[in-house]
Regions:
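Loop-to-transmembrane alpha-helix initiation sites
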Residues: 13-14, 70-74, 123-129, 155-163, ...
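Cytoplasmic-side transmembrane-helix entry/capping segments in multi-pass membrane proteins
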Residues: 37-46, 69-75, 95-106, 130, ...
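N-terminal topogenic module of multi-pass integral membrane proteins
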Residues: 1-51, 55-61
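Helix-coil boundary and interhelical linker segments in multi-pass alpha-helical membrane proteins
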Residues: 1-10, 59-68, 113-126, 171-183
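Structural signature of hydrophobic alpha-helical transmembrane segments
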Residues: 6-18, 65-79, 123-136
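C-terminal ends of transmembrane helices
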Residues: 22-35, 57-59, 82-95, 140-151, ...
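Intrinsically disordered, low-complexity non-transmembrane regions of multi-pass membrane transporters
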Residues: 1-7, 203-228
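Small-residue-rich segments of transmembrane alpha-helices in multi-pass membrane proteins
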Residues: 45-52, 77, 102-115, 133, ...
Length: 228
């Protein structure tokens, strides 16, 4: 008899999809590029943000796409994107709320990805990898769709690092016998806290060329000038 397929509770998955949809629409509504997005464009970005993480997660795990197994996923993502568009003006003035929303979305998708990978029998390291990909996948697709540089590839407040820390906490906790649900909650909290602190205190990984400068300075006693 085949082992039962691990299923994330529908309400939990839809919560992540909805929050991601709102966050994507808020981002797209505030976009000020050479070509402004119309209502359809903003809605598409919201849907991509809401559903992207789950799609990437299930593709990596070679599982049926959860987002295509129910009408509720697309409906939730679309409705959330519309809410994000309608409330874009008031919510953009609440920067702390947007940062918190972003942190929770990353944490949820990371926790769901890692939990599902562990439940399907993946070892710790691959499970954490799946979780991180699920956490940042929506943001990557958003940037690709909007023709922007992929944010996680550039210097900025900790994003993938926060997701990795939360996913690792989840995986290690479960390894030591903590129930998967409790471990997932801990993972979401860790991811959200690190992400918020990174934004508040402007924390980021060092730039590669800064490491080069320090190495040369240590070896020669001089500070090289590196042109951008």
């Amino acid at each position: 008899v085949d082992a039962p397929i691990f299923v994330i509770p529908l309400w939990a998955d839809l919560t992540a999809v909805g929050l991601g949809g709102i966050q994507g629409a808020l981002f797209a509504s505030g976009f000020r590029g050479q070509r402004r997005l119309d209502l359809l464009g903003v809605a598409i970005i919201g849907i991509v943000m809401g559903m992207g993480g789950g799609i990437i997660r299930d593709m990596l795990l070679n599982q049926p796409l959860s987002t295509l197994q129910s009408n509720w996923y697309l409906l939730t993502a679309t409705l959330a994107a519309l809410v994000g568009m309608l409330l874009a003006g008031p919510l953009r003035r609440l920067n702390g709320l947007i940062v918190g929303l972003d942190a929770v979305v990353i944490g949820l998708f990371g926790a769901f990805g890692t939990s599902k990978a562990l439940a399907l029998g993946l070892p710790l390291v691959p499970a954490v990898f799946v979780g991180v990909c699920a956490a940042v996948g929506g943001g990557i697709l958003r940037d690709v769709f909007m023709g922007l540089p992929v944010a996680i590839m550039h210097v900025g407040s900790l994003y993938a690092v926060a997701a990795a820390a939360g996913c690792l906490v989840l995986g290690v906790s479960n390894l030591f016998g903590v129930p998967l649900v409790a471990a997932a909650v801990a993972g979401v909290i860790v991811t959200a806290v690190i992400r918020v602190l990174a934004v508040v205190f402007d924390l980021s990984l060092p730039e590669q060329r800064m490491l080069y400068r320090r190495k040369v300075a240590a070896e020669t006693g001089t500070l090289p000038i590196v042109k951008p």
